[in-house]
Amino acid sequence: MITSIELRNFRNLENYKVLINKPLVIIQGLNGVGKTSILESIYFAATTKSHRSSVEKDMIQYDKPYASVKLIEDSKLHEIVLTPNGKRTTINKSEVRKISDYIGQLRVVMFAPEDLMLIKGSPSERRYFLDMELMQVSKTYLRNLNSYKKILKQRNALLKKNRNLTDYTFLNILGEQLYDVGIQIFDERQKFIEALNQKFKTIQTKYKDFEVEMLYEPNVTKENFLKHLKTKQKQDIMYETTTAGIHKDDFKLLYKGLNAKDSASQGTSRLIVIELKLALLEWIKEVTKTDAILLLDDVLSELDLERQNLFMSQLSKNHQVFITTALPINGHIDFQKIVLQEGETINAK
């Protein structure tokens, strides 16, 4: 459980500290005061990434030299300092130089309005989801993914520089290396999706009218991947890129057997993604034997009272949960309330 959050120059929060004393934390305030920034800081401290922007320096307050996040979680101090030139990660004040050694020390599951892109967005956004979640629990996956990206970059560079290439020896060597790593990533993604579908079934025993399923859509089968790499060299040379592989995978979220992208309303889409995140939470617990922290940004908006109550009833008491909202919280639940105004703590009780 996170017991302390301390931020410096992070977004619009210049000097912010709050102590946490309950598993359920409700962060209230008007739009623009920094509610989402608190959740982003926790996500950043856990994953070294922002869920909002691919430009890391955007997290540094304007005209400041750095931003920092300090979290105390189960007596362990997590700290990440971001400058325009890079970032520095420490655990209990000892520097962790390899990001692969840092990721997974603190595990989080995040829901934000942007996550509707898991249904409506591009395949690259869905692949990013697969990678981020698997990286948190599997060092092997992270290592394989980094290797795959490195080999893919080499192969694509070779394809671009040698448009008249006729000797495919080195191209085939890179193809075999890509295949060896790629099929391991394929297997982990497939197992991950199968595991989430099992979690969906468990959740659906309580809510039988809400059927969600995840369908893996690999770009190419394991059996055909190596064959493609060894027989489609001319095609890859023409397009100057590797045209098949796990870097082009996708998945669909199905609602009552239909593609949610085409069949689900905005409100239903939010619930589908929420269901996905709750399943993910339970999967992480099963695999790692630890409880991930659930971060919910503006999760209650666009949900009617019945759906709000349905959602709140599903929150496990075993996980720490942070929720941002501009709405009053209904129901008899025990929580810590933090009210933000102009980036400062007005009330935390």
From Swiss-Prot:
InterPro entries tied to this protein: DNA-binding_RecF, DNA-binding_RecF_CS, P-loop_NTPase, RecF/RecN/SMC_N, RecF_2
Descriptive protein name: DNA replication and repair protein RecF
Q: What is the lineage of its organism?
A: Bacteria, Bacillati, Mycoplasmatota, Mollicutes, Acholeplasmatales
| Positions contributing to ATP binding | G29, L30, N31, G32, V33, G34, K35, T36
Identify the species of origin: Acholeplasma laidlawii (strain PG-8A)
The record's NCBIfam families line, in alphabetical order, gives: recf
Q: Note one Pfam family from the annotation.
A: SMC_N
Annotated GO biological processes are: DNA replication; DNA synthesis involved in DNA repair; double-strand break repair; SOS response
The free-text function statement in the UniProt record for this protein reads: The RecF protein is involved in DNA metabolism; it is required for DNA replication and normal SOS inducibility. RecF binds preferentially to single-stranded, linear DNA. It also seems to bind ATP.
